[in-house]
Amino acid sequence: MRFWLILTVVCPLVLTAENPVIGNHRAAYDSKGMLLPWTSWKDALAREMNWYLQCPVENGYPRFVYMTFMQGDYQPVASRRDFIPSMEDGMGIISYLKYYAWSERKNPRILGFARSMGDYLVKESLTPDTGKFPRFTRSTGRRAQFPQPPDCGTQADKPYEIEPDKGGIAGYALLSRYEETQDQRYLDQALQNGRVLAANMVPGDEEHSPWPFRVDYRTGESRGPVSANMSFNLRLFDKLIEHGHTEFNEPRAKLWDWIKKNQIPNLAKNGSLWVQFFEDHQEPDNRNAWSPLNLARYLIERKEKLDPEWKQDAHALIEFAVRNFTSIRYGVPVCGEQTYDKEPWGGVLSTYGAVLAMYSAATGDGEYKALANQALNFVLYAVNDDGCPRENAVRPGRGGWQEDAHTDKIHNFVDAMTAFPEWAN
């Protein structure tokens, strides 16, 4: 693979001088120039989780549950009131549930914080009970709102817009939360999101996904014909079907048919069906790495139950990310987010590392194993000694965008440590 050629050139150069500072720590390399972790993964993650478990609770929620931009002293970033509830808290629920299980279910406070994220989604972040997308979880909002007002859209969303795919993320996370606690509220909201998605689904083709990227929840007026992230809507439908809700069989079949026949083949073309995911962007040609990597993750998890060609398709999805979004930082191949922002933010880089690790473990193919380990080592250099992380390891600091710093990161390390348990130590 071409990255190995790059590594043989870059890493020896790194070793000829004093090792650089990556994020918050002096980098450590082995004799072959491969980046080592600054502490064990298990220790770094424990420090980070402990730091978040000390987060002040106000209005019934830890602060990071209702704000996206939080500093290293748990205070809000004054200049940033925008907030991404479905993505931040949805992926946070998944992270906390996975870490709770991986850490042998020893600390009930972890489960309690997952409950706080679920409660915020079902109590504070819904659209009004009217219009085309009623009682649907919001993609964006404003920090410290209880509940979010009807016109709370921020970042690149207009005031009354939602992003359908983010409802898939929130719905899937809430259903996972329901499975842990049997709290009916979470199942009810997952069902509501699923039913609203099914009611607003349209036929996809070579230029349109089954849902647009943005929609005015009142009128259904759409903006952006393609939404790249279809894997979580598929996950939500699949999980609702598992719980006996067969009404989702037909929309699920139509969605998978479009993914398999249109979206995956588009990887080898211009990538036009892989544009639009991040809440703060609206460029129509903005391809991203997060969506194909998360579809690859689902194929790897389900294998032949979902896709008889899962190995081939997962490889193509990974290669799309490698081809379009990777670069070298401090001798380490890293993955960026999107066409218009190729910084190795913590969420996408940990996603990249986890999916490559999962593919390596599932197939026995070593093509990506070292790349996965290096990427994830890089991510953890953002974690300070006291456990407070920065949003990426490009420079020193504390806090920032919480989805990148924490909530869309922890579950990726759990997946990688499940694939290769020895990496935890």
Task: Give the location of each predicted region.
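Core register positions within helices of long alpha-helical scaffolds
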Residues: 95, 117, 170-180, 193, ...
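Alpha-solenoid helical repeat scaffolds
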Residues: 102-106, 124, 180, 200, ...
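Alpha-helical repeat scaffolds
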Residues: 249-252, 310-314
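CBM-like carbohydrate-recognition segments
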Residues: 10, 58, 327, 331, ...
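Low-complexity, Ser/Thr/Pro/Gly-enriched N-terminal "stalk/linker" regions
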Residues: 18-88, 109-154, 185, 192, ...
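Bacterial N-terminal signal peptides
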Residues: 4-14
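Solenoidal tandem-repeat scaffolds enriched in leucines and small polar residues
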Residues: 164, 168, 175-179, 183-266
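Solvent-exposed loop and edge beta-strand segments that line ligand/cofactor-binding
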Residues: 19-30, 34-41, 71-90, 99, ...
